[in-house]
């Protein structure tokens, strides 16, 4: 450990959705030359093998678990920049999506520390790839919303409603405890979704531990997925007609890509 006359540089690196080989080439190169790596709890051990020479510091950040306070992480990054040349803050998914990167950037910039953000693949995109279903579909889904319930759950009382945005495809991060409530509200709102709307839930997406649960919004509202969840794994909840493989009506299978026929029967 050495002290530098000028601060080191901090890289906020997106670790991607889970699998170690889904980190970007730039991210892997930075890990290989990092002096110290501050990593999220959800980062796979195999990814940390990419930085064998670096000091590795776990900083938590796991929904529902004891973790480092954000202001404490900010301070540790600033302090590390005084002692090391290359500092990596390894964040699950993409740093700029539900990663509180803005707080770290502001803290480092205020301290005169140079910061660079290296994007990563967010879990929603890996989830769509895993089930082989696009989040958008011509004639069916033109909008996608990513929603996190982590902070909202802390501030919201049990009886208060969840704010569901209006979009054709909805992807919820960290919403395991609220799945039935989400489904009930979407059905009751009668906007873009109904009881027969497809639902796909993925845990530990892109890793060897990945599990999938597929059904409908109605089944989700009945709590059918509650006993399926593994509380130790991150869950992704995907909802929308674009996720339907086939539409079955009167024993007739209609390919979801046949927009004209779909609109004729269901539009």
Protein language model regions, located:
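Short, hinge-like loop/turn segments at secondary-structure boundaries
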Residues: 55-58, 75, 106, 132-138, ...
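Residue-level signal for well-ordered alpha-helical positions
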Residues: 50, 130-131, 185
């Amino acid at each position: 450990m050495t002290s530098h006359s000028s601060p080191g540089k901090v890289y906020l690196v997106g670790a991607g959705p889970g699998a170690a080989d889904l980190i970007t080439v730039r991210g892997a190169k930075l890990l290989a030359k990092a002096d110290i790596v501050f990593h999220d709890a959800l980062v796979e051990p195999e990814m940390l093998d990419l930085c064998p020479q670096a000091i590795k510091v776990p900083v938590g950040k796991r929904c529902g678990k004891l973790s480092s306070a954000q202001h404490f992480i900010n301070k540790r990054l600033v302090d590390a920049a005084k002692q090391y040349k290359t500092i990596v803050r390894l964040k699950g998914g993409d740093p700029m999506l539900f990663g509180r990167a803005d707080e770290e950037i502001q803290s480092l910039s205020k301290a005169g520390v140079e910061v660079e953000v290296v994007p990563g693949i967010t879990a929603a995109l890996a989830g769509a790839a895993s089930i082989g279903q696009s989040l958008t579909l011509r004639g069916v889904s033109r909008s996608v919303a990513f929603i996190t319930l982590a902070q909202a759950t802390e501030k919201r009382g049990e009886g208060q409603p969840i704010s569901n945005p209006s979009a054709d495809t909805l992807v919820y991060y960290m919403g395991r405890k609220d799945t039935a409530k989400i489904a009930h509200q979407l059905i009751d709102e009668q906007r873009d979704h109904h009881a027969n709307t497809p639902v796909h839930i993925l845990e530990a997406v892109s890793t060897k531990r990945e599990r999938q649960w597929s059904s409908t919004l109605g089944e989700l509202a009945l709590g059918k997925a509650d006993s399926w969840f593994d509380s130790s794994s991150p869950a992704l909840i995907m909802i929308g007609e674009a996720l339907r493989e086939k539409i079955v009506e009167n024993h007739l299978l209609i390919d979801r890509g046949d927009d004209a026929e779909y609109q004729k029967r269901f539009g």
